[in-house]
Regions:
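Conserved ATP-binding N-box helix of the HATPase_c
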Residues: 69-90
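Glycine-rich/acidic phosphate-handling loop/turn and adjacent ATP-lid/helix
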Residues: 111-136
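Detector for a conserved hydrophobic position within an alpha-helical segment of the HATPase_c
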Residues: 151-152
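Short beta-strand/loop element within the Bergerat-fold HATPase_c
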Residues: 92-104
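Glycine-rich phosphate-binding loop
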Residues: 137-146
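Conserved glycine-rich
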Residues: 156-157
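Conserved catalytic submotifs in the C-terminal HATPase_c
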Residues: 54-64
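Conserved DHp (HisKA) dimerization/phosphotransfer helix of two-component histidine kinases, i.e.
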Residues: 1-52
Length: 177
């Protein structure tokens, strides 16, 4: 069992390194790209690395919403990585991403069928967005803080966090032009 955990951690480190290399190669490009295309590429990457992870995407945007690919990757890669790290014991991890809105702003509903938030965050779930807050023993508490600041960088905001039955976060991404 310990060997399985060590192997899983090694894969996670490799994937995180790959993600960071992708971002640094582009020097954090802020030019807008279609969110629909970005989110599908992100989901495919994670599902190809983890056969037990299923990412279901539903997009209902009246007009194309555009965002920096790097900002979108930071947000969604961190959310998916957190879900994976919290739920390595699951046979199947289902992640649902629902995106709806217009070309000016979208609402994103991200949820997984995992363990949810740690007990310390159930009454005050927004605390998880603060720097160095984590429910994992080996967590550093930066992932959700980075997600939150990336959302705010595009005039967005986190509206709902619930960790009772799996993890759920609903947030708005604003105008990026």
């Amino acid at each position: 069992m310990l060997e399985d955990i060590q192997e899983a951690n090694g894969v996670l480190v490799e994937l995180a390194t790959s993600m960071l290399e992708d971002i640094s190669k582009k020097s954090f490009d802020k030019s807008p790209t279609s969110l629909n295309g970005i989110i599908n590429r992100i989901a495919e990457k994670w599902m190809s690395e983890y056969s037990w992870v299923k990412v279901n995407i539903s997009v209902n945007i009246l007009e194309e919403y555009r965002i920096s690919e790097d900002i979108a990757r930071v947000i969604f890669d961190n959310l998916i990585l957190n879900s994976i790290q919290q739920n390595t014991h699951k046979d199947i991890l289902d992640i649902d991403i629902v995106i709806k809105g217009t070309s000016d702003a979208v609402t994103v509903i991200y949820r997984d069928n995992g363990v949810g938030l740690g007990r310390a965050y159930l009454k005050e779930p927004f605390r998880i967005l603060e720097v160095h807050e984590t429910s994992r023993d080996d967590g550093h508490g930066l992932g959700m803080w980075i997600v939150h600041n990336s959302i705010r960088s595009v005039q967005g905001g986190v509206e709902i966090i619930d960790g009772n039955k799996g993890f759920l976060i609903e947030f708005r991404l604003g105008e990026t032009r």
